[in-house]
Design a protein with these regions (language model features):
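Terminal alpha-helical anchor/extension segments at protein ends
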Residues: 1-149
Length: 149
């Protein structure tokens, strides 16, 4: 089972216990440093930026906003690609037939689309929710495949 959000990822091994149902063991945790902090803190050339003016000309406000939006979009794309690469590596190293995946709805589809098809086809359950901060003992309540019958 893998749970992720925009900045971190946790992989759990599901161990079946005959009396208590499934138990989860954390096997890997991963944080992406680019996902944390403000965009202005990451742009190294803030001293050389052109002033933004309200009037017409090459340095008016909207161009500056568009540049920041492009940079934020590119950063999001890189983070999602890095998460997909880490997921592919974890799933490839694991011998189980299927795995469950949880991510916030706003990034879930993008990450799944970036996964190699062999990894994507092994997903047995999709949960569109941010479960990274949920403690392991309570995660099984969010996955139908882990609930006791």
């Amino acid at each position: 089972m893998i749970v992720t959000d925009r900045g971190s990822l946790k992989a759990y091994r599901v161990n079946e216990t005959p009396t208590r149902g499934p138990s989860l063991q954390l096997v890997q945790a991963f944080n992406i440093t680019d996902a944390h902090g403000r965009l202005i803190d990451k742009v190294s050339d803030s001293a050389g930026r052109f002033p933004v003016t309200e009037g017409a000309g090459p340095h008016r406000g909207p161009a500056s906003i568009a540049e920041r939006t492009q940079l934020a979009t590119e950063t999001d794309r890189r983070i999602q690609k890095e998460l997909a690469d880490q997921i592919a590596k974890i799933v490839s190293q694991n011998e189980s037939d299927g795995w469950s995946f949880a991510a916030p709805a706003e990034i879930h589809a993008a990450i799944v689309d970036l996964l190699p098809s062999a990894v994507r086809q092994r997903i047995v359950e999709h949960v569109k929710s941010d479960l990274v901060k949920v403690e392991a003992a309570r995660l099984n309540t969010h996955f139908r495949s882990l609930r006791q019958i």
